[in-house]
Amino acid sequence: TSEELNYIIEHSESKAVLVENKYVFEKIKKHHNDLSLIVFLDNSMHNPDKNIYSFDKFLELGKESLNGKEDFAINKSKKLNNENIATIIYTSGTTGKPKGVVLTHGNILHNVRVLPDIIRLKSGDKLLSILPIWHIYERTISYVTAITGCFTAITNKRDLKIDFTEEKPDIFISVPAIWINIYNTVMKNIDRKGFISKVFAKTLIKGSIRYTRNLRYQNNLIYIIGDETKEEKIKYYQIGIFDYIFHKLAQKIIYKKIIELTGGRLRLTISGGGALPMYIEDFVEAAGINLVVGWGITETAPVVTLRSPYKNYRGTCGTPIPEVTIEIRDKKGKVCKDGVMGVCYIKGPNVFKEYYKDKE
């Protein structure tokens, strides 16, 4: 909101801002005369007399100021260490005014260092990302792809379908809302069909999901809390011959179109930033797309846990990434038993330094 943006400018004592367009520019109208530099990312305004620059002109100024000294950034970086502040990212302010999360180079580099091995990124992989570029989720992923020699394409809801087809990504970085939307679109298209075709398609999907879920139980890839043993679950979830047939038919008739829609090369999709409903996971997995879920927050740069694509336990948000430990404690500070709710304590090199101007 305009109120949040103006608060962030004031609280951070910012002297320069980059704005997407005139709409955002108007939201910070009260600070137009206070700022030393305003850069328009869409190049829609350029007025140096008022300290306003288009992005392209701003880049030209940067090249001129370097004056052939391309090693300027490298020399600067040599003076940095893991404890130096890399960025301050403000939270959404859902529990009050936005808080400035102070992240160090060490915080971010920890995620950058450990994530490629978990998801087994290969040089030359192409990633498609629909994340907001100001979120730490997107920023960390961009750093990860840069150091592994991968290519990242940035998309949005409007262009997602076209970019899937044109970019043909190996990995899709997403949020739950995208997969919910894809699922709803498929179901709406099925509902528009005639009665027999509609019932047939839904029967195939239902049988296919049942087959995929039962296969998970047989392969011991569902986390179980409660009195039932894994042996009891495996015995109960036997794979039926008809479900197998339904699954194969669904692959040819329904899922094939989804695979084509996502470019035909999708090896993995990572979902974060919110809870993903189990029925969506069921559907995406049945369609033949390997989906992993992670959990994290801005204060941890951001990944804390992530499911492995090769040991993808459903019903969880994964195990702690390397060098990170988690404990769930009760109000007295004692570690809770499995399945008992409590407060999550996180320790690791990715945990932020402090809240800006709010160390308490």
Predicted regions and their residues:
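A short helix-loop-beta submotif of the ANL/AMP-binding
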Residues: 1-2, 7-16, 125-126, 143-153, ...
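Conserved AMP-binding/adenylate-forming
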Residues: 212, 243-360
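Conserved pre-ATP/AMP-binding loop-to-beta segment of ANL
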Residues: 63-90, 120-126
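Structural core segment of the AMP-binding/adenylate-forming
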Residues: 1-61
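Conserved S/T- and glycine-rich ATP-binding loop of Class I adenylate-forming
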Residues: 17, 85, 91-94, 127, ...
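Conserved AMP-binding A3 loop
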Residues: 86-112
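Conserved AMP-binding
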Residues: 130-135, 273-275
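Conserved AMP-binding/adenylation subdomain of ANL enzymes
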Residues: 109-126, 133-230, 237-255
